[in-house]
Amino acid sequence: MEEDKRTFLRIPTNLRGRIRLLASDKELQLFREAPITSTSVSVMELKSAGVNEALVNALAGIDRKLDLLISVHSQDNLLDDFPHAVQIGEISGAGVKLTSTLPLEIGQMIECVITLTQVPIRMAGVIGRVVRNEDVSGVPGWAVDFTRVRDRDLESIVQFVFQTQRDELRVKMWE
């Protein structure tokens, strides 16, 4: 995230993530979040088909709960694939600053999965290179530049950054 090549807004944050170390920059990305699709029947479609509104609401509630259960199950697999926990202290579309008890080296390639929201769960996966060491309050920290990000994951990160900025502006407006 060098100053001269920064084209994304960087914000302070407190997100959790998981990483795995890569042997080279040629490794394929392991994390893949399913795209948001509209394969399920929408509430509006059920209502227009004449389904009772109480039943429509019950079915929508079940759908949300199933999504949550699937997310919890996916988290278990994530812990196996990405064994190292990290805290994300800053994020942008170009990289992150993270802290971890796992020692990293400058030049080390990592794959990182960032939990952007918890309910509903929204994650983004990136591959990046550790570019510098930056300890935070005595905890080892590193700046990581993204080297490969899928468009969908980049869009999720950028949306998170903008939503966070909007939320902060609204809070300041009421102070």
Short names for language-model regions:
Residues 1-175:
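Structured alpha-helical
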